[in-house]
């Protein structure tokens, strides 16, 4: 399995280097990337933490200005407060769907409720959850997509995620 990951990473890096010249020609002036991580399901603002309402309002603000917005999360979104723990992350996915997330990486805490619950959350999400290296043992198939490509205005973006071992 490790050899497959090394080959995938080498191919990804090779393609990335070939595309660098094209990226320099792209116009990024209208692109806004909103990134969250380690939100742990906080649906409202708390000390030092912006909630989903703030994230959603920020996205809507930029869209109203005609910006091309990409809203992504780097993981650890579905666990660690009473509401999301009670719903096993279901409420966090509902908030993220309502906020208009484009993609999410699997963090180590996405696995806290077990693989079956995570599979339910993946099905509920209106956005792809990504991980290039999580394989379901029973099927030997990937749990999620490894990458996704977005076109925002004149810019093409590829997102890929490699999960940290849990």
For each predicted feature, which ranges?
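Acidic, metal/ion-coordinating pockets
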Residues: 25-163
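Bacterial N-terminal signal peptides
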Residues: 14-20
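Positively charged n-region of N-terminal signal peptides that target proteins for export
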Residues: 2-8
């Amino acid at each position: 399995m490790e050899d497959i990951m090394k080959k995938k990473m080498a191919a990804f890096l090779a393609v990335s280097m070939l595309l660098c010249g094209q990226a320099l020609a792209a116009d990024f002036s209208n692109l806004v990337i909103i990134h969250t991580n380690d939100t742990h399901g906080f649906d409202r603002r708390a000390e030092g933490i912006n909630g989903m309402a703030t994230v959603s309002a920020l996205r809507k603000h930029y869209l109203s200005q005609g910006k091309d917005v990409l809203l992504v999360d780097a993981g650890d979104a579905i666990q660690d407060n009473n509401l999301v723990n009670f719903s096993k992350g279901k409420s966090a996915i509902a908030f993220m769907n309502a906020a208009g997330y484009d993609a999410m990486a699997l963090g180590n805490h996405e696995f806290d409720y077990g693989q079956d619950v995570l599979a339910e959350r993946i099905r509920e999400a209106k956005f792809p959850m990504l991980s290039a290296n999580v394989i379901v043992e029973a099927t030997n198939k990937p749990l999620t997509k490894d990458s996704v490509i977005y076109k925002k205005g004149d810019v093409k973006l590829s997102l890929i995620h490699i999960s940290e071992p849990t």
